[in-house]
């Protein structure tokens, strides 16, 4: 098996605190439960024929359009007006950088590995998430689904990331908190670490790197 030359990190839930905490804070401030939010998403998806989150994360749907359709559905479900304006700002207000993992990425760069962020994200949120860590100081490549028109676990976003890193699939390792994204990466030959905790992810990454030195 080829030596790992590049490490690809997810953003939300890996380089940040768990996403569930931000969703929980939003539901508390809005009075909309996660269950109701999920029901609204499913109803909008049934009408559109596609999950609206997928279109949001591939730039086919703006944040305003996405939140507007959910607000209309939630208003119908709950029988009261629901406003979702400022969702992104409220969401990021409760998201914290995962400093130990960010420091580990910085260490890997110093050890000679090429680094990338491959994120399913929202076009309008780019200034918010980039403000959370020194992206350009640590990472060689950023692949953001909202600007590429493809999202994990679709193969094309992995291929784009590998191409921009200049490495073959067998020389790359992905760290992601979504298991299906890890499985999709493995299917094309990328090693993958399923992130469940910072300590576990670092240990599993070190084990996968083997000799601990990049090319």
State where each predicted segment sits.
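Residue-level recognition of short, well-ordered coil/turn positions
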Residues: 60-61, 113, 147, 166
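Generic structural signal for small/hydrophobic residues in well-ordered secondary structure
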Residues: 10-13, 59, 108, 117, ...
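Asp-based, Mg2+/Mn2+-dependent phosphohydrolase catalytic module
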Residues: 1-5, 9, 122-123, 127-215
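Glycine-centered short loops/turns at secondary-structure junctions
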Residues: 110-112, 189
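N-terminal helical cap/lid subdomain that shapes the substrate entry/recognition surface
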Residues: 2-102, 110, 207
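Short, flexible loop segments at the rims of nucleotide/cofactor-binding pockets, characterized by
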Residues: 91-96, 120-121, 150
């Amino acid at each position: 098996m080829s030596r790992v030359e590049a490490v690809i990190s997810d953003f939300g839930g890996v380089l940040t605190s768990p996403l569930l905490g931000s969703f929980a804070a939003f539901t508390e401030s809005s009075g909309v439960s996660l269950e109701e939010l999920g029901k609204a998403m499913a109803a909008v998806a049934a009408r559109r024929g596609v999950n609206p989150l997928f279109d949001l994360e591939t730039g086919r749907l703006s944040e305003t359009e996405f939140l507007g359709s959910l607000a209309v559905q939630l208003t119908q479900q709950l029988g009261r007006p629901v406003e979702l304006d400022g969702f992104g700002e409220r969401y990021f207000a409760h998201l914290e950088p995962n400093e130990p993992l960010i420091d580990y990425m910085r260490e890997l760069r110093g050890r000679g590995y090429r680094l990338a962020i491959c994120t399913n994200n929202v076009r309008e949120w780019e200034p918010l998430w980039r403000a959370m860590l020194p992206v350009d100081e640590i990472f060689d490549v950023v692949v953001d689904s909202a600007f590429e028109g493809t999202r994990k676990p679709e193969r094309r976003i992995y291929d784009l990331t590998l191409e921009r890193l200049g490495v073959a699939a067998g020389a790359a390792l992905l760290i992601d908190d979504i298991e299906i994204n890890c499985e999709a990466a493995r299917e094309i030959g990328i090693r993958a670490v399923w992130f469940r905790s910072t300590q576990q992810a670092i240990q599993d990454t070190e084990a996968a790197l083997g000799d601990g030195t990049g090319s």
